Structure formats: C-alpha cells, structure tokens
C-alpha cells in the first residue's frame, strides 16, 4: 500500500510537471511496472473494485456534484448514461458475436462490460485544458449513472447465459425494478443519515459517518438485487445538496478535505492498478485456442465499434430531435464542437476491467474477453488521453472566464450582504454598542467589495494589499508563537489553539490571493440577468462620460478612488463601493438612476442597483 501511494504521488506530480494527463501516465507506468521483477501481482478482483473502490469513488464525486446542474442537464445525461450504454451493449455485442465463436448472450455481456466510460480521466483533462463547465457537468453526470446501467445490463446478460429464457420484457422489468429499488434505498439512506448527522455536534463523528455512508447505501441495495451503485449516487447527491442544512461549517470543511484526499488517492491508484494488469492478461491468453490474429482483430473491432457508436449516438440524439421545428425552438441545439468533444471523451476505466471478471468461469473464451476489455480500456485512455487536449484547443472551446466568475461571485455576495444586513436590523434591540454594529455592517460589505475590486484595474486593490500585508504579519506572529513553544513555559494545548487560529486566517487569505491572480484574455461581457431586469434592457447604450478623467466628486474633493463606474442614464463617473467616497452608490441614492456600468478598460458589465443583478 505504501509503495502504491508513493507511486501515485510521484506519478501525479510528474504528470503535472510535464503538463499531461495523470491517468494516462499512471496507466503507462503500471504497464511498464508489471514487468519489473519483484513487483507483486495485484489482481483487480470484482469484490475489490465493486465493493471496495467504486462506492467511495462515486460518493466522493456525487457529494461535490450540483444537484441543480444535474437536474438542468437530465436529458443529455440520461441519453449518455442509459441509452448510450444500451446501444453500445447491443452494437458491440453484435460485432463480437460476428467475429468470435461465442453465444449471443456472451457477446452482449462483453458489450455491457465495455459500455460505461470513466469520466475521471476525461474530467481531469477537462479541468486542465479549460473545457466549458456544461461539458464537464454532463461528463461527470454520465459517469455517476452509467456504471449502474452497465452492471444491470451485464447481470441480465449473465442470467441469459446461465439460465436462458430471458426476454426483452424481462430485461426491461429487471432494469426498472433495480433502478426504483436503488432510488428508494438511496433516498432512505440520505434521509436517515441526514437525520443522524443533523443531531451530531462533534465534527469527527460527523465526518466518520460520512465515510461509512457509501457502504450504508451500497450493501442493502445489492442485498435486494437493486443497483448499489445508483443507490450510492442518489444518497451522495442528496446529502451533498443538503450539506448546508445538516452540517456545521467546520464539519463541511473537514468533510470536503477528507473526501478530496480519498478521491484523489483512489482515482489515481485505480489507473496505476489498471496498468499493472497487462502482464497477467497477456499470460492468460496462452490458454486460448483462438488464433492471435483473431484476438487482435476482435480487440481492434470492438475498440472501433465502441468509439464509433458513441460518435453516432451523441450526434444523432443531439441533432435528430431538433429537426422538428417545435423542438428546435424550445431547446436550441448546442454548438457542434461541444457535441464533438463529448463524443470524443469516452475513455474506459476500472469498471470495465472489474466487470469482465464478473463473467462466469465457464464463459466461452473468457480470457479473450478479459484481453478485449483491457485493450478497450488502455486504447481509449491512450487515444483519447493524448488527443483530447489537442481537440479542445483545435475547436477553440471557450474556457471559463475567471473575471466572469468574479462578477457572478460579487453579485451573490452583494445579495447575501443585503440579506445579512436586513437580519441585523431585525436582531438589534438598541443595547448593542454602535462600534459593534458598524463593524458588522462594514465586514459584510467589505466581503462583497473585495470581489468587485478584482474585476478591473491594473493597480492592486485594497483587499489584495491587505491580504499581502496581513500574511506577512501572520508569518511573524507564527514565528513568535513557535519561539514561545520552544521555551516550554506555556501549555502546549494553548499554543496549539493559537497556531490553529492563525492557520485558519491564513488559509482564507491564501484563497483570496489565488482568486486575485486569475487573469482573463477577453473583455468581460457577462450574460447576466438582463432578460429578467427591465432596467438593464432599457439602459443599453452608453452615454458620453461627463468626467472621463476620473470620479467627478473625487476630483472636486481632491480624493482618490479604486475603480470607476459610469451612470448609464446621465454619464456621471463615480467611484466604487471599495473607494472611500462610494460616490457611484451615492449618485444612485440621490438620482435613482438605476444602472451603472464599469468604466474600467476592457470591461463591459453593467449593474442594476434596484434589482441587484448584472448584465
């Protein structure tokens, strides 16, 4: 285990340094390592993968997946994770049946084995090269559900191999029962675990319950022959969505850190283990009576069929229904290059290798099926892993704009601050010191203003200057506390509490520093909420600025400003809320002109004071 984790850490660090996909590098390293003398034979057994690795992997992904985004993309996710898996099962099964001397049921089982893509590799590339977020959401949503579809389909094919008498109706019935049972158990586990965690006050106990949750959902579902994988996903989606209501803030931070670490180690260990299987897979082929040319042809044909079917299905299901004018008007088609990238992101992973070992020992040419599953897994990882970054760059897919993110973040903070100040007004009873109330108001507004500051200008805004100086102060404060600790005159528990508080403050400053260093390459023109705001629809054309040299009031007063805003009604130039004068907001209060726009170079966003939305 120590050697495995060490190799994973070294491999991911090397991949990051070389600018390549970590899963791809780890698979190659595993293939080479399988032939190194002294390396033990680590078999990927079904129990190890399906019970030991898959539940925590899926749960870690599910709790960080937005349930709202998942619902918003239900149609494409369902078409990929359910329909495409079935289409691939049938298509690949027919190809294998045509090439290999095996029964149709066994060939369909092979189709189910290679049907589910593994989005870990694709999304790791997606985040590295900057794919649009909707593509990443669809790929992650597909990976959460397609394993369940493939395993249920495989179970049905195995039943047809061993018992016979399986009909289309029985397959459909088994699938529906398995899905419904999994959803019921997943919802029940989410409700039960949520009820318990809401009443647990100790963070360590709360996070420990979280670590058990994947198996609390998986094992009962499998016991009643439902999909344990789908039960884990449902429980994870619901608990992640309700985390703000059932957990304390410190528990949420601790849980995110723990699951991020677990997910990182498991995801990358899996790809190293995949590579380590190559030697045993090739050794087992010596037992087959098929010609190596037939095996090679079958591997290539199944790989090509797997890739081609995804292309055909994704394009057909995306643009076929939109040939109907009513459908096209209600749901316009996405750009073709979005569809092309999703079609090309069909890498296979550990579920394919684990599923092939679920085939009974008496399956005809089982060792050949294992080799084909490995060939499809390794082939898609190598082919897509090497070419997907190039394809994304070649198709000029727009990456997420950090300044667009800052704009949306600032809008949310502004609305949150507004809600918090309203609550403050209702909570006050008149006995509070004025300096306490003013400090609360200032702190609430400063958080939103700090994000607004990062939206433009070349000079360092006050929040960045504060973070830089405060981090330097914290460094000296920590050195002094460590000096006191070396003297041994203060209790270690007291000193550790002080050091922990310094760590918490510095971690917040580090997050702010990372956000402030993000750069954009295009002008900031957000989609915003213009469609829902009458004022933003009205004030579109910019008037002539009255004082293009700077804030009108600051120029009169001889004071300075941070960033500039322009009134879209009269052309008044005022300073932002981070500036001492806050003249832009004062102009709105005095004139009730609702819309202003940024007057910073390269920015075209607007803000409605009345409705608190951007456009």
Model-derived segments and spans:
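Transmembrane helical cores of multi-pass secondary ion antiporters/exchangers
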Residues: 1-411, 415-418, 482, 486-489, ...
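Beta-sheet entry/capping signal
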Residues: 107, 565, 572-573
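Short loop/turn motifs at secondary-structure junctions and domain boundaries
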Residues: 261, 556-558
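Intrinsically disordered, low-complexity proline-rich regions
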Residues: 488, 567-568, 605
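Cys/His-rich, Zn2+-coordinating zinc-finger modules
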Residues: 528-550, 557, 572-615
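Canonical RING-type zinc finger of E3 ubiquitin-protein ligases
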Residues: 559-568
């Amino acid at each position: 285990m120590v050697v495995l984790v060490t190799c994973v850490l070294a491999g991911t660090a090397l991949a990051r340094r070389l600018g390549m996909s970590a899963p791809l590098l780890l698979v190659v390293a595993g293939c080479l390592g399988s032939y190194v003398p002294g390396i033990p034979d680590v078999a990927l057994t079904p129990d190890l993968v399906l019970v030991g690795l898959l539940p925590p992997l899926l749960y870690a992904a599910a709790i960080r997946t937005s349930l709202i985004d998942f619902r918003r993309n239900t149609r494409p996710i369902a078409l990929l994770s359910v329909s495409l898996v079935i289409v691939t099962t049938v298509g690949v099964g027919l190809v294998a049946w045509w090439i290999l001397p095996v029964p149709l049921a066994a060939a369909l089982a092979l189709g189910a084995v290679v049907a589910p893509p593994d989005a870990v590799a694709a999304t790791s590339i997606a985040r590295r090269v900057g794919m649009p977020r909707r593509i990443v959401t669809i790929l992650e949503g597909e990976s959460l559900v397609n394993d369940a579809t493939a395993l249920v389909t495989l179970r049905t094919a195995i039943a047809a191999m061993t018992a016979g008498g399986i009909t289309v109706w029985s397959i459909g019935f088994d699938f529906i029962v398995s899905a419904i049972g999994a959803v019921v158990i997943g919802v029940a586990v989410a409700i039960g675990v949520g009820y318990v965690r809401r009443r647990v006050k100790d963070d360590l106990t709360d996070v420990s319950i979280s670590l058990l949750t994947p198996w609390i959902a998986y094992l009962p579902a499998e016991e009643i022959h439902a999909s344990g994988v789908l039960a884990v996903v449902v429980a994870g989606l619901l608990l992640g969505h309700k985390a703000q209501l059932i957990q304390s803030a410190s528990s949420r931070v601790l849980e995110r850190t723990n699951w991020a670490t677990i997910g990182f180690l498991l995801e990358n260990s899996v790809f190293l283990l995949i590579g380590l299987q190559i030697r045993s897979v090739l050794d087992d082929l010596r037992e087959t009576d098929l010609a190596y040319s037939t095996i090679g042809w079958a591997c290539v044909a199944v790989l090509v069929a797997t890739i081609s079917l995804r292309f055909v299905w994704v394009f057909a299901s995306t643009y076929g229904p939109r040939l109907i004018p009513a459908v096209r008007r209600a749901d316009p088609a996405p750009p073709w290059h979005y569809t092309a990238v999703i079609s090309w992101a069909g890498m296979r992973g550990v579920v394919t290798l684990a599923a092939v070992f679920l085939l009974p020992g008496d399956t005809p040419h089982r060792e050949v099926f294992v080799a084909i599953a490995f060939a499809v897994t390794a082939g898609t990882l190598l082919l897509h892993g090497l070419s997907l970054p190039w394809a994304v760059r070649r198709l000029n897919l727009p990456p997420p704009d950090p300044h667009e993110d800052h704009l949306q973040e600032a809008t949310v903070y502004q609305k949150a601050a507004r809600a918090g100040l309203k609550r403050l007004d209702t909570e006050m009873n008149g006995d509070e010191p004025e300096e306490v109330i003013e400090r609360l108001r200032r702190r609430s507004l400063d958080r939103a203003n700090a994000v607004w500051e990062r939206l433009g200008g070349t000079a360092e805004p006050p929040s960045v200057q504060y973070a830089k100086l405060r981090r330097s102060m914290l460094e000296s404060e920590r050195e002094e506390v460590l000096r006191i600790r070396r003297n041994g005159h203060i209790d270690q528990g007291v000193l550790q509490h002080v050091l922990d508080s310094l760590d918490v403050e510095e971690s917040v400053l580090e997050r702010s520093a990372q956000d402030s260093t993000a750069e954009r390459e295009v002008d900031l023109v957000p989609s915003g909420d213009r469609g829902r705001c009458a004022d933003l629809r009205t004030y579109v054309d910019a008037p002539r600025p009255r004082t293009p040299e700077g804030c009108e009031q600051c120029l009169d007063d001889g004071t300075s400003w941070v960033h500039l805003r322009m009134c879209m009604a009269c052309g008044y130039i005022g300073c932002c809320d981070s500036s001492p004068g806050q003249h832009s907001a004062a102009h709105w209060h005095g004139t009730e002109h609702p819309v202003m726009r940024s007057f910073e170079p390269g920015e075209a966003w607007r803000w409605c004071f009345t409705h608190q939305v951007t456009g």
